[in-house]
Amino acid sequence: MTTPFQTRRDFLKTSALAAASLPFVGALAARAQTAAPGRKLGFALAGLGSLSTNQIAPAFKKTNFCQLAGIITGTPAKAATWKAKYNIPDKNIYNYDTMEKMADNPDIDVVYVVTPNGLHADHTIKAAKAGKHVLCEKPMEVSPEKCQQMIDACKAANRMLAVGYRLHFDPNHLECIRLAREKVFGNLNMIQAEYGFRIGQKQWRLDRALSGGGPLMDVGIYALQAARYISGEEPALVSATQVNNDPVKFKDMEESLTWQLKFPGGVIANCSTTYNFSGFDRLRAFADRGWFELAPAYGYGGIQGKRSDGKWTPIAGIDQFAAEMDDFAQCIMENRPTKVPGEEGLRDLKIMMAIYEAAKTGKTVSLT
C-alpha cells in the first residue's frame, strides 16, 4: 500500500466531493461482482475500532454465508495487525483514499461501515460507487439529508443498503414482538424503554461533528427502535426533556434525555437515555392483562426476559452480528429486501431530530 492513509477527521472535509460524484456511479456499478453460487460473500470492514475488533470480526467465525475478506482503515499500524491476524492479502487492504479501487476486486462483495457516525455517508457512497453492497452501523448518519444521500447512492449503483440494527435478529426481542403482535396479554398500552451508560472523557462520541449528538444517537436509538417495533407503528407526536449537569464535558450535546412518543393506535412510549450513569438497560411493555420485559435488554449478550404470568421460557442467546450479517448476505444472494433497509435508518433520524427539537423548544412536535 503506497497511497498515504487518510484519517477519519480528514475525511469530513471531503464529504461534499463524495456526494457530488454520484452521476459516475452507473458505469462502476455495471462492473460490480455478484457472489458465485456456493461461496461466502466477502466483507470488507471500514473502520477498525473497538466494535470491529471485539465484536464484528470474531462474529465471522459464526456465520454461514460471510467471510472477512478485506479491511479499510486510516491507520497503517492497524492494517498491519489485522493483516497478520486474519491473513488478509495486501490487495484487499484499502484506506479511505483508495476505496474506489475495490471496483476491480471480486473478493469483496459487501462493505460494512463501522466508522464514526458523521463519516457514514462518505464511506457508504464510496463503497456504492465501487459497486459494493453496504451494511452500515447505526445510527445511519447524523442527519436525514445524509441518510437520503446514502439511499440514493446505493439505488443509483443498484446495490443493497442495510443498517446494523442487530436487535432485529435477537430471539428475545423477536419474542417480545410476537407477544405484542399476537396480543398475548391483550392490547398494548404503554412501553418503557431505557438505555445508557457513563461515558469516559476521551471519546470520539463527545465530538459532535463525528457523533451528531449525545447518547440519543449512540444508545438511545435502541430505546427508540424498541418502541417502534414493539408498538408496530410510527409515532405521531413527541415531547422531550434534556438534562446537562456537566456542561463542560457535554458542552455541545445532551448528557441525558427523556422523551415520550404517542402512537396513532393510542400506545404511549416513555424512553430515556444517558451518558452519565450505568445500570440503565430495560424494555417493558404493558398490555390490558399483563406485561413483558427484557432486563438487561440491549447488550451483545445476557439479555433476560420476563412476563407477568411467569411463563417466559429462557431463550439461548446468539451472536447478533453474525445473525445480521448472514441475513444481509442471504438477502443479496436471494435478491430479496432486507428488513432493515436504509429507509429504516432514515426514519430513526427524522424522529431523533424531532426529539432534539422538542427538547430544545419545550413543545410537542408532530411527526405526521
List where the protein language model places each region.
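Predominantly a Rossmann-like dinucleotide-binding segment in NAD(P)-dependent oxidoreductases
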Residues: 39, 51-52, 160, 167-251, ...
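N-terminal Rossmann-like dinucleotide-binding module
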Residues: 15-87
